[in-house]
UniProtKB/Swiss-Prot annotation:
Disruption phenotype: A double rhsA-rhsIA deletion is outcompeted by wild-type cells, restoration of rhsIA restores normal growth in competition experiments. Restoration of growth requires the RhsA-specific immunity protein, rhsIB does not restore growth. The lineage of its organism: Bacteria, Pseudomonadati, Pseudomonadota, Gammaproteobacteria, Enterobacterales. Immunity component of a toxin-immunity protein module, which functions as a cellular contact-dependent growth inhibition (CDI) system. Specifically inhibits its cognate toxin RhsA. Cell contact is necessary for growth inhibition. This is Immunity protein RhsIA. It holds the Pfam family Imm-NTF2. The gene is rhsIA. Residues 58-77 are annotated as: Disordered.
Amino acid sequence: MTELSKAEKVLKEFIIQMNQWELKYYPLFRNEGMTAYKDAAKKELDDIYDLFCTKKERKQGRQISLSCGEPPEYSPDEEVLSSELNKNKCVFITQQYTEAKNKFRYTLQFKEDEWRIDKKERFSFYDDKWIKYNL
């Protein structure tokens, strides 16, 4: 398996697990409120991030807000449009087919013999550039 294939496998598995997390917690939050499930949702989300993402403090984003929706932002149908490998960094551009049909750019880093997702960006057609987007 090539390094590019290994990195893509990490990205796809992350997307699948995030999709499952959203599918599980969105109805619970909507129907019963966040308070009852906040701790369990945070733990499961932290476990996903610990498994797939670079180890760094994320002061904003899903780990803080526990945001999820219907349809889920993450979908197994998200298509990889292009990929690029450069030494210890791999970049994937994907197309979302749910919600706003965004284009995303994921950057993965190779550290300690494994690929980890470091950041996510969304292409802004209005600004005609990639902008930071929370994982």
